[in-house]
């Protein structure tokens, strides 16, 4: 936490030998909060929270995260076996203005997405920390001119659900977009955030299992190769991976790929690193 903090503290010190009670209130005004595991900073954090010993309870707080407004509140509790933290988040963000996506992708997006989330953190007194996150939103007001299957008009509902379960070493991120797209991934926490393995399954009704080895598997619907090549030529892959490491073994499967006035059916493309560079097989 960076910046000036105003606080009031009241100590109740019994003279009969009972435990001291510390109560008070803390006021934040345009502070910055650095989140180390994400290498990200909440800016302009403002609001109040009160405490009674180790139990904290905040009022609604406001902040700016990824250049977007954020509403947040939290509470903590000293449980019998663990210190527990609960956080509620919500916002209405414009994906094209987060500063995270490549310029070529930003140009193809417009609109905003309203979302809310809950974070639960368990800090056992005699074991390692665990946490869970659930985010829900709807891309109904987002318009995308990206190639299919990422194209969508504004006004078309596309509910998104994301869940995270993890500890200090790794976490699994899963979820779905609409009724027929599911994804599953495992991330490792170390010097850098590392995607160990992931899978995206289109036209699926259930969560797919993780790949058996490190890598990314993309099971996609029919694709227009020319549109995707044009997007990559505009730099759609630039700046991706700046804050994280990604596997070099990638498998793409599609029932149909059109490219150069040609059409390939039931295609599987595998890209993997070699001593001399990258080997791509189809």
Question: How should each PLM-predicted stretch be described?
Answer:
Residues 1-173, 186-282:
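Membrane-proximal interfacial segments on either side of biological membranes
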């Amino acid at each position: 936490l960076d910046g000036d903090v105003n606080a009031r503290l009241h100590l109740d010190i019994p003279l009969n030998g009972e435990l001291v009670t510390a109560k008070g209130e803390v006021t934040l005004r345009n502070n910055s909060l650095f989140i180390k595991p994400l290498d990200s900073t909440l800016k302009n954090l403002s609001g109040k929270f009160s405490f009674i010993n180790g139990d904290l309870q905040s009022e609604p707080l406001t902040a700016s995260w990824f250049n977007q407004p954020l509403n947040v509140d939290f509470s903590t509790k000293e449980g019998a076996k663990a210190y527990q933290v609960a956080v509620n988040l919500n916002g209405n963000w414009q994906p094209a203005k987060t500063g995270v996506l490549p310029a070529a992708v930003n140009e193809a997006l417009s609109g905003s997405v309203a979302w809310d989330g809950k974070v639960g953190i368990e800090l056992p007194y005699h074991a390692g920390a665990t946490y869970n996150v659930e985010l829900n939103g709807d891309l109904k007001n987002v318009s995308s001119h990206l190639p299919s299957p990422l194209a969508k008009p504004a006004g078309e509902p596309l509910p998104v659900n994301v869940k995270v379960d993890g500890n200090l070493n790794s976490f699994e991120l899963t979820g779905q977009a609409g009724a027929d797209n599911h994804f599953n991934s495992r991330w490792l926490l170390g010097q850098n955030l590392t995607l160990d393995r992931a899978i995206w399954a289109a036209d699926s009704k259930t969560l797919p299992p993780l790949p058996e080895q490190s890598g990314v598997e993309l099971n996609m619907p029919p694709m227009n190769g020319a549109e995707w090549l044009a997007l990559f030529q505009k730099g759609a892959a630039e700046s991706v991976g700046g804050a994280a490491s990604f596997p070099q073994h990638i498998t793409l499967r599609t029932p149909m790929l059109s490219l150069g006035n040609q059409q390939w059916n039931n295609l599987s493309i595998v890209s993997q690193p070699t001593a001399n560079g990258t080997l791509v097989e189809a």
